[in-house]
Amino acid sequence: IQIGVVVEFLLYVNILTWPVAVVGWVTSMVQEAEASQARINEFLNEVPEIKNYNNESLEIHGKVTFKDVTFTYEDTNITALKNINFTINPGETLAILGNTGSGKSTIIELISRLYDVTAGSILLDDKPIKKLNLNEVRNQIGFVPQDPFLFSDTIENNIKFGKKNASEQEIIEAAKNAVVHENIIDFVHGYKTILGERGVTLSGGQKQRVSIARAIIKNPKILIFDDCLSAVDTETEERILANLEKVSKSKTTFIISHR
């Protein structure tokens, strides 16, 4: 066998190896894509259980009433709330304290209509919440969770998410009320600082305060704070609470704490 023939054979083998390898690679990708597409189709075909039965615009004042409210989670059959009754008017604050799993967050989820009650009724301004425009109701709720979600965007845009057309002065004012303005201006790019995934650029306390600013700037009729100061030191917490007392004077406020 001549050297040229051997070289020619090796070149042909090399040329054929890549296409054969690609066939196996593409086959694997197609199988993964089919599984992903099936999951996407399942998600897109999901029908929301909570439906909006009214598209009429309305003015919300913020009075919230629970009448004999009972709620049971269908998937676990656990009754989180049983015969709950209370009324809170605009300008009032309701503190909800309790151990983990006692139903504190369930109350908030029912007010936001993430779930509907199993029994009893919830009234907003003396009207059944189920019969009100769902979008209007949620637009008038400012919610600050314990574990805030921030986008991979600038701090400014994360705060403006609560109010898209907010002015620079409104953004700064909201940040000051949340006692995070001083931290923001310490960054090289200030409010233009781009955050990492889920806000990893900021500390836990800073993320919570940016989330508070986002809720405040929205100027909703109902404010909900779900243990949102758990990562903040005592001195800063006192300053924030003092500011929130001023901001929420005419609003219905819910404060949840595990303490």
What are these regions (language model features)?
Residues 1-10, 20, 30:
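A hydrophobic transmembrane-helix motif
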Residues 15-43:
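Cytosolic ends of transmembrane helices, especially the final helix of ABC transmembrane type-1 domains
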Residues 42, 49, 160:
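Conserved E/DxxT/N motif and adjacent residues on the DHp alpha2 helix
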Residues 46-49, 189:
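Flexible, glycine-biased helix-capping/connector loops in cytosolic signal-transduction modules
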Residues 49-59:
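Pre-NBD coupling/linker segments of ABC/ABC-like ATPases
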Residues 59-259:
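ABC-type nucleotide-binding domain
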